[in-house]
Amino acid sequence: MPKLKTKSGAKKRFKITGTGKVLYAQAGKRHGMIKRTNKQIRNLRGTSVMFKSDGDNIIKYFLPNG
């Protein structure tokens, strides 16, 4: 059986912490910012921790070596 390859799109979008959690960037900051409040824009900064069940699926299917 060949080795599983890491999906290159997932490699760019997700980061796995040392404890096995998956970090991702908040969506919704590409365009259309004029209609959002400053608080909404501020809350979209930085990274978030994915729910465990979703993060486990990301690791299993898209980042098998990560």
Swiss-Prot record:
GO biological process, one term: translation
Gene Ontology MF terms in the entry: structural constituent of ribosome
Gene Ontology CC terms: cytosolic large ribosomal subunit
SUPFAM superfamilies membership: L35p-like (SSF143034)
The entry's keywords: Ribonucleoprotein, Ribosomal protein
Superkingdom of source: Bacteria
Keyword Hydrolase on entry: no
Gene3D superfamilies membership: 4.10.410.60
Presence of the UniProt keyword Ribonucleoprotein in the record: yes
Record HAMAP family: Ribosomal_bL35
Family per similarity comment: Belongs to the bacterial ribosomal protein bL35 family.
Name of the protein: Large ribosomal subunit protein bL35
Organism: Methylocella silvestris (strain DSM 15510 / CIP 108128 / LMG 27833 / NCIMB 13906 / BL2)
Gene label: rpmI
